[in-house]
Amino acid sequence: MDAIKGSELQIPDAIFAWVLDGQGGVKPLTDNDIIDKDKPCWLHLNYTHSDSADWLAATPLLPNNVRDALAGESTRPRVTRIGDGALITLRCINGSTDERPDQLVAMRLYMDERLIVSTRQRKVLALDDVLGDLKEGNGPTDGGSWLVEVCDALTDHASEFIEQLHDRIIDLEDDLLDQQVPPRGFLALLRKQLIVMRRYMAPQRDVYARLASERLPWMSDDQRRRMQDIAERLGRGLDEIDSCIARTAIMSDEIAQIMQESLARRTYTMSLMAMVFLPSTFLTGLFGVNLGGIPGNSWHLGFSLFCLMLVVVIGGVAWWLHRSKWL
């Protein structure tokens, strides 16, 4: 296998190009560096930048079918073995639970024992954790450990996001116990976030499990075991997502029941008010349409007596409703 020279990986608009020093640290790539399995190169690109796109389209260091995938063609998490290398698509959780649920960032990478090429359009926050460890000298030492650390960081971010959603569901359940209904669209957004998470994290767990079972030459048995642990941890997160989705369905039914009961109470109250004032409306209408003149209009106490009669009628109807336990 021909050696890779550092000059072949120099891209002006690359996000960064680092060489792993084999001791947990990194150093910037130079033209004189020789890339091998002991000191692999990590090249991180934004595939929308012109120089990076041109390099991806023309470089002989990548297989032809890898170039299109790294340029943004693949979206769902998946892994494809290509010789001794692997083409991997992963999803990362960026931001907070207040964002729209489609804010899952795609990261695509191809790696073998000497070269790691990762691409993205939007920033992948999980990579900052790995890069920070490398700059402090506590990071991965080779390609296999790098992949494990990246997958672990992605799972940490996913688990944290799932925990935030779980806390919001608990708060929502407490509010419903106090008959407090959430704002319109709040529960729908929360449910959609969970469904989108389920859609992408389930195949991502399968990617981790596949990497744990593949006999890639640049991954050790210990690294495969760690990858299997990561897959199981993400699987537990998926179980939590399923539980949260079921709980949101129950809360949706509870909210509908609360709204129905509130509407029924209002309708009941309006019906009682109509029943109370119906006799008085009848009497006032009856007196008003008397063509021979309103009875008692010539007596100075006629209007007062009529008002008193209305009060007695309304009071009698209210007493009857109360005795019948309608009021």
Swiss-Prot record:
Membrane protein topology class: Multi-pass membrane protein
Protein name (Swiss-Prot/TrEMBL): Zinc transport protein ZntB
Family, similarity comment: Belongs to the CorA metal ion transporter (MIT) (TC 1.A.35) family.
Domain of life: Bacteria
Cited PANTHER family: CORA FAMILY METAL ION TRANSPORTER (EUROFUNG), ZINC TRANSPORT PROTEIN ZNTB
Cellular component aspect of the GO annotation: plasma membrane
Catalytic activity: Zn(2+)(out) + H(+)(out) = Zn(2+)(in) + H(+)(in)
Membrane-crossing residue ranges in chain numbering: 274-294, 301-321
Molecular function GO labels: cobalt ion binding; cobalt ion transmembrane transporter activity; magnesium ion binding; magnesium ion transmembrane transporter activity; zinc ion transmembrane transporter activity
Alphabetical UniProt keywords: Cell inner membrane, Cell membrane, Ion transport, Membrane, Transmembrane, Transmembrane helix, Transport, Zinc
Pfam families (alphabetical): CorA
Function, as annotated: Zinc transporter. Acts as a Zn(2+):proton symporter, which likely mediates zinc ion uptake.
InterPro entries associated with the record: CorA_cytoplasmic_dom, CorA_TM1_TM2, MgTranspt_CorA/ZnTranspt_ZntB, Zn_transp_ZntB
Cytoplasmic compartment segments: 1-273, 322-327
Periplasmic side, ranges: 295-300
Primary site of residence: membrane
Gene (name only): zntB
Subcellular location field: Cell inner membrane
Keyword Cell membrane part of the UniProt annotation: yes
Organism field: Klebsiella pneumoniae (strain 342)
